[in-house]
Amino acid sequence: MAVATHCFTSPCHDRIRFFSSDDGIGRLGITRKRINGTFLLKILPPIQSADLRTTGGRSSRPLSAFRSGFSKGIFDIVPLPSKNELKELTAPLLLKLVGVLACAFLIVPSADAVDALKTCACLLKGCRIELAKCIANPACAANVACLQTCNNRPDETECQIKCGDLFENSVVDEFNECAVSRKKCVPRKSDLGEFPAPDPSVLVQNFNISDFNGKWYITSGLNPTFDAFDCQLHEFHTEGDNKLVGNISWRIKTLDSGFFTRSAVQKFVQDPNQPGVLYNHDNEYLHYQDDWYILSSKIENKPEDYIFVYYRGRNDAWDGYGGAVVYTRSSVLPNSIIPELEKAAKSIGRDFSTFIRTDNTCGPEPALVERIEKTVEEGERIIVKEVEEIEEEVEKEVEKVGRTEMTLFQRLAEGFNELKQDEENFVRELSKEEMEFLDEIKMEASEVEKLFGKALPIRKVR
């Protein structure tokens, strides 16, 4: 069971595009044209996927669906300053420009215009340092770019969580802490009642918390977002009479058929009045709280031993996520206990046949050459055809540049001109930490142009 952290940041869509040259096709959906000495940037709508599962399977929408969205999308034109103009900017203004462009490239295209402007304003006002660090960090920038592929999908939340799974690191955590918890730039997802607290009568009436001691595998899970990862081996030990500590680990599959391992420590306290309820509260990161409900268990020191846990939780970004898992001593779900599990699942209105069996063979990662061959084989058939057709669409849209109405990105670009008049106030507002960060990164004008003139690589993070 993975830690639920829906936020600004758990695999990422395999057909994101970047532009690496002035007239090229890129994976982020950004094209650049130089007209009368000024760079114009076009933001293309993100390609969306109909299905994204933790098993690593991908099912993308057909090209015709993408082309339809392409032709109907709004193409926003942003005049960028020239290199000479950039060189005249001071470091504080460069930092603010980075923030504006980050919003334009990575946040605004994915959301409603009004909400996006509110989010950008919040980030630029309250999370300048964290935003700048995120854009300068490949994993964090790739994570935000990955999120754009989730926009308006039926499984938008699940897709966002999978992005976080792939690109999680300390910079992402710091950005989330500011944007989600401290400054609340992201609205909290409300509880839709999908995972209600179960009636106490369906829980085990007696449970010795020490029975959780030792190593357990998750061999079956309800929620594909949190529960169905490979190689879920969790080791528990008790502290005192009613405290349980779990060292949990799971594997995240990557797009090239590889994987890397995530781990976390979770601490639970047993409810003194309901032995079948365990609470994991008082966590700093996103202030998440998980409640575990034990539906059924059998402890006989045999391979068929199991503990069936249903859970629900909340954090600063999402109230009401949940799922259910079956812990077994065996790495494979024993068939002999399935009737008991079916009965327990039915008690909370769930069908156990919909649960997903996990793969706990925990084998080695495929050789790099095998992963590359598989990735190339799966992608080369799509790339040639789509590049040709997308280039044709791009050229048609470029002809419409002169007739483009004022858009959100034009307003952002106009805001850049105001930055030049606001330098004195901006410098006065900078904190000591922000000034130290500016000195630390020593971001030159050419580096800013390079950062936003080329693609942010979405790559496997080790």
From Swiss-Prot:
UniProt keyword annotation of Transcription regulation present: no
Region (Involved in the binding to the thylakoid membrane): 380-391
Activity regulation behaviour: Activity limited by low ascorbate availability. Feedback inhibition by zeaxanthin. Requires the presence of micelle-forming lipids such as monogalactosyldiacylglyceride (MGDG). Low concentration of bilayer forming lipids, such as digalactosyldiacylglyceride (DGDG) or phosphatidylcholine, supports a slower but nearly complete activity. 80% of the specific activity in lumenal chloroplast fractions is lost in vitro in the presence of reduced thioredoxin.
Catalytic activity: all-trans-violaxanthin + 2 L-ascorbate = all-trans-zeaxanthin + 2 L-dehydroascorbate + 2 H2O
GO CC field: chloroplast; chloroplast thylakoid; chloroplast thylakoid membrane; cytosol; extracellular region; thylakoid lumen
Localization in the cell: Plastid, Chloroplast thylakoid membrane
More about this protein: The amount of VDE in vivo is estimated to be 1 molecule per 20-100 electron transport chains.
Name of the featured protein: Violaxanthin de-epoxidase, chloroplastic
Organism: Arabidopsis thaliana (Mouse-ear cress)
